[in-house]
Amino acid sequence: DGANDTIHFYYRNDTLAAENNLASLDGKVSVVVNGQTCPMTYDAANDRFGYDLTGVSTGDYYYYYVVDGTGELDAFNSEKADYSGKECSVCHFKKANMSVAASLSQYAMDYNDNNVLSVKLTAKDGEGLETSEIAAITADLSELGLNREFAIDPTLMEGTISCLNTVAAGEKTIPVTVKDIYGNVYTTATNVTVTERKKSAGDFDWDEAVIYFAVTDRFFDGDASNNDAYGVGDYNTGEKGGSSYHGGDFAGLNQKLDYLKDLGVNTIWITPIVENITEDQHDNKTDTATYGYHGYWASDFTKLNKHLGTEQQFKALLDAAHSKGMKIMVDVVLNHAGYGTEKYFNSILTDADGNSISMIRDSNNTISGDDKYDSLSDLPDFVTENKAVTDQLVTWQTEWMSKYSIDYYRVDTVKHVETTTWAAFKNSLTKVNPDFKMIGEYSGAGYANNAGELGTGTMDALLDFDFNDFAQNFVTGNISSVENSLQKRNNAINNTSVMGSFLSSHDEDTLQYKLVNESKISEEEAYNLMKVAATLQITAKGQPVLYYGEEIGQGGANNWPLQTNRRDFDWTELEKQKADSNSIYNHYKTMLAIRNAYTDVFARGNRSTVAVSDADGYEVISRSYGNNTLYVGMNVKEAEKEVVIPVAESAGTVLKNLYDGKTYTVSADRNVSVTIPAAKDGGTIVLTAETKTEPAPDEKQDDKKTDTAESNGNAQSSGNNANQSTSANKTTPKQEEQAVAEVTVQEESFANVIEAVNKAKTGSKIRVNLLKTTKIPANVFESIKGKDMNVTFKVSDQASWIINGKD
């Protein structure tokens, strides 16, 4: 107890304690410290003997217990030494004269940022503390809405922090506490300014990411000149080519960005980009050549894989994606290298004396079967517990991010690397770009088991390995139990600790394949149920992660080396599905349009059950955030389902189905009768309140269908009208007549609107006539924000929106 210059000694005989007879030793127990006998007192409340040695100073203390005349060493202290000819247990006490300071890499942050909190210990005089003498460093992040005891690794002396999106702007204090192994406590604090998040047009938050995972080599061949880039014959799209290169590349991704944008995704996850081994890892059983087309068998972390393209093509992909408001997520590996690369990687590092540092694990530092200290699939395993090795791996991956302005990383094999490495990696990336995020692949992770990788300064999200099981169970009839789990999951997720919801991946049988081969249903039924599974995924909290080809009903088995779950994307099939209004492709496109239009509801909203029946194969849930509530219905049966559900809206309110455009009116008892289509027809409804059937007494007119604007400038003009309203008030032409300044928007340029707003005086009213568009860009709202004025956007002769700058 360093704070009180005290050492507390305790003794208990477990056998006597189990017999409730420890008190029989009262008066017979003492501790001998540095030769001095000290009687111990029985503590009935804790059923143990204790003695406090006070007034201690820095030094070593040798002790043993005497129990009923017999000496005993401390059974829980392995350190022992001789003192005056007597074997003793040993403890150490140190009172360091230290000061502690804390600082941040950024003085200000918003809820989408990360920030590196650094701690520095300085000896005022005399001896300081070694890293091994620091027991714990914690930061109180409660003013940022997070953990009161955020742990910082003493070997790093810094950790990456974040902020909940519910925290109000303003200056926040972060107290920091350092405890040493001697019980001394050192405290300090630092401040950070939380600012309002300002999103430019087309920007989105981390928890609003809609991710599309493309195995780059299998997506689209945009440059045939790199198909046999190394001249070793590793390009083969034939029957035996399941584990060879197929030609997909950066140029192909670039050419298909418009397809992905139109589909509704905003983030593209691509497989690792670095150079991979060129040697054939032949499978003799099937006589099949296998190569590193997937990117996970790195041979050089400083070069691009030539099969994927040049540095210019990679930069062009990133630039083009960014110009379209999309982000690129690159898959990275820090756990292992490709087969046969031991000699190369062991030749890279040397210590201060010029001695080689082995980057690859050998028999001397392998623990057989251990997740972290053994190799995965016999791949060369990096010795990441060695700081020099970690530093090199972190440097390589940070340089790629910095050089090309990569937006996000998907981190492979998180389970197989120490948390200290991931913390160091996150710190390095955050210092370059506070907005940079990582989603980790921790095999088996889910909302109830994040393995300590969320909210701890390492990963910003984890891939949810539970979700495809949830989806499989849901569409095969176990609806209520899955809903139970999804509501718990909903409560566990926030913008700093996100889960990526995937149905299929490159490492597993696809969900559609499992429905046929595990759940034993027909191909046609599996295809239909994938629509319902997609609705479950897209409307759930967390980041939807689409696996390429899933949106056109493509799937297969994780059957190496054939890898039918990694087929080339079928662009011919896509064109067929575009022409079929009831195709799974059009289902995905519709649902993603709804997701993007109501992104705050789906990314952050509450989830509640409205109605559910396992026997009848349906459920209706509500997703609500702020003033918006959506009702999502799903039906896994082959026939449509008529359902009466209670709603929060008042009688007469018209609910519109964003999925097919149909409307339903709330009854006097605040119920609504809806039809959920059969699974083959999408099995989906998404209801939102549109209008009331009876106007207010002073408004003798019929409400008409209206379009709405979206505050982030990303309203979707889909056939389903999946557009989200801002927190504005719907008005009538009678109210609009008070406007004193009028601006007309002919096309989609709002420059004259912004100019009028900037020139307007306090208390002004402006009317904007929208002739050909109902999409209002974010910078228009930014120009209005904070100003004392009303701006009315007239969307039709019957309805308008009033935006108050102070609201």
Spans of features found by a protein language model:
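Insoluble glucan recognition modules
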Residues: D1-A136, D140, V176, V210-T216
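Active-site-proximal helices and loops of the catalytic beta/alpha 8
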Residues: G27, V31, L318, T395-F502, ...
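Aromatic sugar-binding surface patches on proteins
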Residues: A45-D52, D153-I161
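Substrate-binding/active-site clefts of carbohydrate-active enzymes
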Residues: D203-A209, D217-Y404, W422-N433, K437, ...
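Long, contiguous ectodomains of secretory-pathway proteins
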Residues: A214, K734-D807
